[in-house]
Amino acid sequence: MKLTCVMIVAVLFLTTWTFVTADDSRYGLKNLFPKARHEMKNPEASKLNKRDECYPPGTFCGIKPGLCCSAICLSFVCISFDF
């Protein structure tokens, strides 16, 4: 019974926290569609086409293997295989 009450309070707290910290999305779709139409007319304006520079082999890649040009990060260093 005690565990059930604790779980209910935790769920209510997390639910209210989500609503309090969420962005105001009332006008989200209103601003989204004109931007999408502009990106269809000008594909260069799309943020999805922009990619950060990739790291060459032998450089430190940390814990993000997607930053390597070869997409292989082994022991925190970008590596490449030449076939």
Curated annotation (Swiss-Prot):
InterPro entries: Conotoxin (IPR004214), Conotoxin_d-typ_CS (IPR012322), Conotoxin_omega-typ_CS (IPR012321). Residues 1-22 form the signal peptide. The keyword Kinase does not apply. The keyword Secreted applies. The modification 4-hydroxyproline is found at P56, P65. Expressed by the venom duct. Keywords: Cleavage on pair of basic residues, Disulfide bond, Hydroxylation, Ion channel impairing toxin, Knottin, Neurotoxin, Presynaptic neurotoxin, Secreted, Signal, Toxin, Voltage-gated sodium channel impairing toxin. Residues 23-49 form a propeptide. It is found in: Secreted. GO terms for cellular component: extracellular region; host cell presynaptic membrane. GO terms for molecular function: sodium channel inhibitor activity; toxin activity. Disulfide bonds join C54-C69, C61-C73, C68-C78. The presence of a 'disulfide through disulfide knot' structurally defines this protein as a knottin. Belongs to the conotoxin O1 superfamily. Delta-conotoxins bind to site 6 of voltage-gated sodium channels (Nav) and inhibit the inactivation process. This is Delta-conotoxin-like MVIC. It comes from Conus magus (Magical cone).
